[in-house]
Amino acid sequence: MANNKSSKKRVQIAERNRLENKSYKSAMRTLMKRCFSACSNYSQQPGETAKANVKASIDSAFSKIDKAVKRGVLHRNTAAHQKSRLSAAVKQAIEPAPST
């Protein structure tokens, strides 16, 4: 337990930052899920509107991930991993692997 004024304040600040980071990560995960669902929708029913939806969702997810790194919520290697997952899903949805 905190014994002096500065350590009590640090506990409060850490809790505040934890909650902010938690909500930011949650928003980021939501955008990633939207991107994955847009990819699956496009795979099932290809079309120009579905393709535009995929592009918009990946752009917003990438933006949120990059901002999370900038704010210190996420490590840059973790962000690169997440962006790679999204890119692979979009690539597979838009350009499916040819059957050989």
Curated annotation (Swiss-Prot):
<dbReference type="GO" id="GO:0015935">
    <property type="term" value="C:small ribosomal subunit"/>
</dbReference>
<comment type="similarity">
    <text>Belongs to the bacterial ribosomal protein bS20 family.</text>
</comment>
<feature type="region of interest" description="Disordered">
    <location>
        <begin position="79"/>
        <end position="100"/>
    </location>
</feature>
<keyword id="KW-0699">rRNA-binding</keyword>
<protein>
    <recommendedName>
        <fullName>Small ribosomal subunit protein bS20</fullName>
    </recommendedName>
</protein>
<dbReference type="InterPro" id="IPR002583">
    <property type="entry name" value="Ribosomal_bS20"/>
</dbReference>
<dbReference type="GO" id="GO:0005829">
    <property type="term" value="C:cytosol"/>
</dbReference>
<comment type="function">
    <text>Binds directly to 16S ribosomal RNA.</text>
</comment>
<dbReference type="InterPro" id="IPR036510">
    <property type="entry name" value="Ribosomal_bS20_sf"/>
</dbReference>
<dbReference type="GO" id="GO:0006412">
    <property type="term" value="P:translation"/>
</dbReference>
<keyword id="KW-0687">Ribonucleoprotein</keyword>
<dbReference type="GO" id="GO:0070181">
    <property type="term" value="F:small ribosomal subunit rRNA binding"/>
</dbReference>
<keyword id="KW-0689">Ribosomal protein</keyword>
<dbReference type="Pfam" id="PF01649">
    <property type="entry name" value="Ribosomal_S20p"/>
</dbReference>
<keyword id="KW-0694">RNA-binding</keyword>
<dbReference type="GO" id="GO:0003735">
    <property type="term" value="F:structural constituent of ribosome"/>
</dbReference>
